[in-house]
Amino acid sequence: GTTGALTIPFGDSPAGLFTDPPRCYMHRQATFIQSFIKDQYPDLAAGEDYDVFVLPSIDKEHGTPLLGAGDLVSAFNDTEEAHELMEFLASAEAQEVWVKELGKLAVNGNVSSEVYPDPITAKAAEILSEAEVFRFDGSDLMPAAVGSGTFWTGVMDYVSGKDLTRVLQDIEKSADEAY
């Protein structure tokens, strides 16, 4: 409920899945939540004790869009070295390092599912590769002062009962300053 949404620390939010009896049966979250689950429940097996699935489409006309985030790289100098670095970072070889060491999802289709460190991340990569529509999380595309600042606190303020018009004005003001 409202109290839980406002008071439970982010990393503790999946805990209800693992109580006896469970306090919840589903938890919508990004794949990185696994790091919190693994730290708090080291005896649980990914893919056996907990798993992931795609939320069904609201309207088949619009498909089943995936919402996510991503790390972006940019070249600011048009040099041979910059081009070589960009090509390397896009290669399966480089992305296998990200997958194995950081638990990230590869965007290079030549990265084998066998290199993923656990079944959840491998399944998430498969889901991503089969997606017809992908959209970046809007808050991740906003300047930090907005996306992880006033937008985040504004949502919490709204859930706690603050007037929506006031919340939106606060977010818009910070966006005007950030952009």
Which residues make up each language-model segment?
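Helix-loop-helix "hinge/cap" segment bordering the ligand-binding cleft or interdomain interface
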Residues: G1-G11, E80, E84, K162-Q169, ...
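Non-transmembrane alpha-helical segments in soluble domains
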Residues: A15, H83-A90, Q95-V99, W152-M156, ...
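Extracytoplasmic/periplasmic substrate-recognition and gating elements
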Residues: D39-L105
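Flexible, small/polar- and glycine-enriched "cap/hinge" segments at structural transition points
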Residues: T121-A122
